[in-house]
Amino acid sequence: ENMVKPANAHLEVTENGYEIIPETVGTELDKEKVKATVKDAIAKGASKVNLEEAGCYTSPEVVSTDENLVKQRDQGNAFLNVTVTIDFADRQEIVDKEVMKDWLVVNEEGNIDLSHEKAKAYVQELKYEYDTFGTSRPFTTADGQNITVSGGDYGWVIAPNDTTTKILDAIKSGQSQTITPEYTYTAYRREKDEIGDTYVEISLSKQHMWFFKDGQLLVSTDVVTGNHNKGWDTH
């Protein structure tokens, strides 16, 4: 009743990488082998038998020296030893073994591979964090007012399929490296402050324009942004 079944050697991601966890022999007996061994001992007049020597304990099917297991360990570590830094100008995301370990899968050929689906799910998380197309932004006007500017058609959109492929290709190259995402839409600046300190500000209500370069006001002038009589109103 208290017999322990054998456990196969298997792979686990540890702080040292992809490691083979050795098999456990256990104490489970093969009942048919025990019966045959005892029967044979009785027939030979033996007073005792060694069940271990007779091979009566069930054995694990996969041991730590298994060639396929060793191959898979080495394949997994080839991936886990790579670090890919994804550059977002003033911010970075790191794809290392802590991120990558959940992407490891066994393919149809029995080799360790990277799951495109799981990698794409990671890229989708990046999109939630870094896509900015059409989002509103805080802005301080030339006269010091803190306002919110509507997003319009300005901003960044990560291309999920191309970015996923780019990350996986970088990992499979075996070389740690820094990459930039692939984008469907791009803006002037990738920093968190996408407007920066060089821009033109126009106030429709005041009919005035300011031009800042590197944070310095270079031009301040009145403008006419439309013509009501011709139906060219600006809003």
Feature-to-residue mapping (PLM):
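Surface-exposed, secretory/extracytoplasmic low-complexity segments enriched in Ser/Thr/Asn/Gly/Pro
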Residues: E1-H235
